[in-house]
Amino acid sequence: MEINWSWQRFNDISGEAMHEMLALRQEVFVVEQGCLYLDADGLDKQSWHLFGRTNDQQLVAYARLNFPNTRYPEPSFGRVLTSKAIRGMGAGRKIVAACIQKSLREYPNLDLQISAQAHLTEFYAEFGFTKVGDPYDDHGIEHISMIFRVPPNG
């Protein structure tokens, strides 16, 4: 299945695309994972949004890249998700790679910090992320902070 990727800032997202984004985030994080939290947390306005759509424009993958000094001093990405329809097809790897590339392009001298679900630390380590600190509970799911260090020469 071919997925077409595009980045948008909050103010450039149409009402329909915003609805699709929020619905898919709720489907994955609230319904599937049982995390009861305010998804529209105010960080969307200070973020780049990655949309992954099929050729028929169905939203099947998503992530957001928070601007520096929004969640952490460094840029960070989160809300990484794929719909059930495409899981196991490598889209998660493409999302993480796209987030790293976008961060390096927009913020070339800044490291990238994430709050990773603990069971995904090895997955993120494959991209160069290292654990920082101890695991912690985030809405009933164990997480750990991880950081991607930008090489000294960018």
UniProtKB/Swiss-Prot annotation:
Query: Which Pfam families does the record associate with it?
Result: Acetyltransf_10 (PF13673)
Q: The N-acetyltransferase domain covers which part of the protein?
A: 8-151
Q: What family is it from?
A: Belongs to the UPF0039 (ElaA) family.
What residue stretch is flagged as signal peptide?
A: none
The upper taxonomy is:
Bacteria, Bacillati, Cyanobacteriota, Cyanophyceae, Synechococcales
Protein name, entry field: UPF0039 protein sll0451
GO MF terms here are:
acyltransferase activity, transferring groups other than amino-acyl groups
